[in-house]
């Protein structure tokens, strides 16, 4: 009788060493650095909010949003910050809707929950008007209908959960009005 023995591809010492390095929430330790995500997000980090393993970012949009979507591991694309839409859906919206910007934060190694999360969306009123054909009805704002309009602009389904806060704001001293939505 002939027996075949299959040898493991790694030695017991290598397997033991791998066991000592716990897999993170969406990948191995340092996956943000290894995939180039830290470098991509670096120009968007908010001054005073880079606190080591936690850093806030703002103004992410367009090409960089598209690039971030391509760099995220498959598991991380479904991340939802406190019932916000999936990160991949928000990144696609920022890639598609002119002027739409995203805010959120990165959690860095050595934390096991290393990730990128998006908790805020800013949509210029011009994108809303292009979609609806009319400006914001401020007397009734924000209403559930406004959320449905925003969800439609973002390309979300009807099952998307509304933000915890939503308002119209003017920023950077310009006259541009923005729809601001935040999931806490």
How would you label these PLM feature ranges?
Residues 24, 42, 140, 171-176:
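Intrinsically disordered, low-complexity regions enriched in Ser/Pro/Gly/Gln/His and often acidic
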Residues 1-136:
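Long, contiguous N-terminal structural blocks used for assembly/anchoring
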